[in-house]
């Protein structure tokens, strides 16, 4: 039945969270003008709620279909997806599908002000995209730090039978290969994340009031479950990094706080006028032990299967996280969804936005083995736990062998750590040997009069959150009419583009950078300055082996190096084969909100034609 515009708009603004998952109002017709028939449909309701996952107290969260974390989406490669979002929040939102390239659907990337208009309170938005690549990805809010309020969930795209796998490099037994394929089809996802008792809005309020960069969390949660641990002073001092001890010994503080955090001193924050008297005690100092929260997450595996597949996903707001499993090495077979030449390791480091897929051989005695997770940054001693249970048994094994302590310190000699920068894609996938275009970035805090929480990738200015509110998103515009700047860059279709990120010292923090719209190759990295205009010029001056154009890592999230008393740099190379307006940014949520992002207009010479459904109607057909 036809409906007029008034009925259409009224329907969008009054959708009930109790509607069945397959419901489409009669006046909201999914547009099939740019995707094939028989799509796989998902419907999510975003609602405000309260949660107490660690036992330290309830706080405001965003629930996805009534749960924290959101449900897992399971697809097959080649599926056409319709992902309907109904916004019951009191604020704008948008949903990004992290790692999905959106090569034929840049209007479904989920970046307000860049690829779409925000989803207003009470409105609905229909994302349409094709599952062109297989592996594990995740969806999350991409508006004003809502990711830190729990709006995320996993995406598993099953691989096609024609995809070559590297499983023969893990085991020489052909019988194991089919067991591994079956384990991968049944992969269990673990969303490992830092957790704050403050909502993201409260975090930003604390930053502005005290004029600090917020660097202290409360706990680590796994699939929305965890606990806040308050360690004795003796243990805190034992676990404090020697460099941190040395630096604090030259200050009035002398030691880390009861929450395990480095105090927000000017030495670490920078030369800003701090207002530390406005800080709530719970922000950096007061530790509230978890009581009565949800139990730590348990992964159940079955010993008869001989192998289990797990994927660790870090949707967290701040910290890269180390992971070990007692008594079990891990065979890493995919990173950011893409197969690699496997590495057998004891420990992986999962940066914000990354996904690590591992096989675990189920050859131990039946029991419950501890999965240990720890913050990798120097600024806080923080750990968390989950469990790997054989056949649902909850008894501890007779001979547990932990590999790291609560703070991430190694408990064994010669622990095998995953080598991110020697990750080789499988099958081999080399980049172009020479780039057509280079963009350089200087990551630093903005100096006064800007706040201590404001960042830049241009070295001059930050990408303000008000970009989300522009009347016409950049994808909707003629790119020739968009003014370019250090924050607005362009490429032509099918160019090979180098992105060189230099992080300013003297304490060059590691940043997890994410490029929307493409995976990229990590062709080089180093500690020190990068004064050269291009990689080709740098090759003439840097040691042989600094750059890799044969088999470099191929990812969508990239960790810059740390530098002590120095700068650090990272060189990425990607193929600009997906025209559209794409965000390139740090995945630490306070850094992104503080300005650490740029917009790249890829393929301006073959700009995509925007479907009317997205230009005017949030992905739906126009009412008649």
UniProtKB/Swiss-Prot annotation:
Induction: Expression is up-regulated during the late stage of P.nodorum wheat leaf infection and is controlled by the cluster specific transporter elcR. Residues 1-18 form the signal peptide. Residues 48-160, 216-373, 474-603 form the Plastocyanin-like domain. Keywords: Copper, Glycoprotein, Metal-binding, Oxidoreductase, Repeat, Signal. Its EC number is 1.-.-.-. One of its GO terms (molecular function) is oxidoreductase activity. Pathway: Secondary metabolite biosynthesis. It is an enzyme of class 1 (oxidoreductase). Cu cation 2 binds at residues 98, 140, 587. Cu cation 1 binds at residues 96, 514. Belongs to the multicopper oxidase family. This is Multicopper oxidase elcG.
């Amino acid at each position: 039945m036809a409906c007029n515009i008034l009925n259409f708009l009224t329907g969008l603004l009054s959708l009930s969270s109790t509607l069945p998952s397959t419901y489409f109002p009669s006046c909201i017709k999914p547009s099939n003008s740019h995707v094939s028939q028989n799509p796989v449909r998902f419907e999510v309701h975003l609602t405000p709620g309260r949660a107490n996952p660690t036992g330290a107290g309830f706080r405001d969260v965003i629930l996805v279909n009534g749960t924290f974390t959101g449900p897992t989406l399971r697809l097959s490669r080649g599926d056409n997806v319709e992902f309907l979002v109904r916004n019951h929040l009191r604020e704008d939102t948008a949903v990004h599908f992290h790692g999905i390239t959106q090569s034929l659907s840049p209007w479904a990337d989920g970046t307000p002000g860049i690829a779409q208009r925000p989803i207003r309170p009470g409105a609905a938005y229909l994302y349409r995209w094709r599952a062109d690549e297989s592996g594990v990805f995740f969806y999350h809010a991409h508006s004003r730090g809502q990711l830190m309020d729990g709006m995320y969930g996993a995406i598993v795209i099953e691989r096609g039978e024609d995809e070559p796998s590297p499983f023969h490099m893990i085991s020489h037994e052909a019988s194991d290969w089919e067991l591994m394929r079956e384990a991968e089809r049944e992969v269990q996802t673990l969303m490992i994340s830092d957790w704050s008792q403050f909502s993201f809005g409260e975090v930003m309020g604390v930053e502005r009031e005290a004029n600090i960069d917020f660097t202290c969390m409360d706990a680590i949660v796994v699939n929305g479950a965890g606990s806040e641990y308050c360690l004795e002073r003796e243990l805190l001092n034992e676990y404090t990094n020697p460099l941190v001890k040395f630096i604090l010994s030259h200050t009035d503080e002398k030691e880390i706080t009861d929450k395990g955090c480095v105090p927000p001193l000017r030495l670490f924050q920078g030369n800003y006028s701090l207002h530390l008297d406005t800080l709530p005690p719970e922000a950096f100092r007061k530790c509230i032990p978890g009581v009565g929260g949800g139990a730590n997450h348990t992964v159940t595996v079955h010993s008869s299967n001989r192998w289990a597949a797990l994927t660790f996903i870090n949707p967290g707001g701040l910290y890269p996280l180390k992971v070990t499993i007692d008594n079990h090495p891990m065979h890493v077979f995919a990173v950011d969804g893409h197969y690699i030449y496997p590495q057998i390791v004891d420990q992986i480091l999962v940066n914000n936005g990354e996904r690590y897929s591992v096989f675990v051989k189920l050859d131990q005695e039946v029991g419950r083995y501890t999965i240990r997770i720890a913050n990798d940054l120097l600024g806080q001693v923080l750990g968390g736990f989950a469990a790997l249970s054989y056949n649902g048994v909850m008894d501890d094994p007779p001979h547990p062998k932990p590999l790291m302590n609560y703070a991430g310190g190694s408990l064994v000699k010669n622990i095998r750590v995953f080598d991110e920068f020697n990750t080789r894609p499988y099958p081999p996938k080399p980049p172009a040997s020479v780039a057509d275009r280079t963009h350089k970035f200087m990551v630093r805090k903005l100096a006064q009069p800007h706040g201590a929480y404001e960042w830049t990738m241009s070295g001059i200015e930050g990408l303000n959150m008000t970009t989300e509110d522009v009347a016409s998103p950049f994808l909707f515009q003629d790119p020739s009419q968009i003014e370019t700047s250090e924050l607005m860059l362009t490429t032509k279709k099918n160019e090979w583009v180098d992105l060189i990120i230099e992080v300013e010292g003297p304490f060059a923090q590691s940043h997890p950078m994410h490029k929307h719209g493409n995976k990229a190759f990590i062709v080089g990295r180093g500690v020190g300055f990068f004064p050269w205009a291009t990689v080709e010029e740098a090759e003439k001056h840097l040691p042989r082996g600094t750059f890799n154009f044969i088999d470099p890592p191929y990812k969508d999230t990239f960790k810059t190096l740390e530098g002590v008393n120095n700068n650090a740099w990272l060189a990425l190379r990607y193929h600009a084969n997906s025209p559209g307006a794409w965000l390139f940014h740090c995945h630490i949520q306070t850094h992104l909100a503080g300005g650490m992002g740029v917009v790249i207009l890829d393929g301006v010479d073959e700009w995509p034609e925007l479907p009317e459904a997205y230009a005017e109607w949030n992905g739906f057909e126009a009412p008649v």
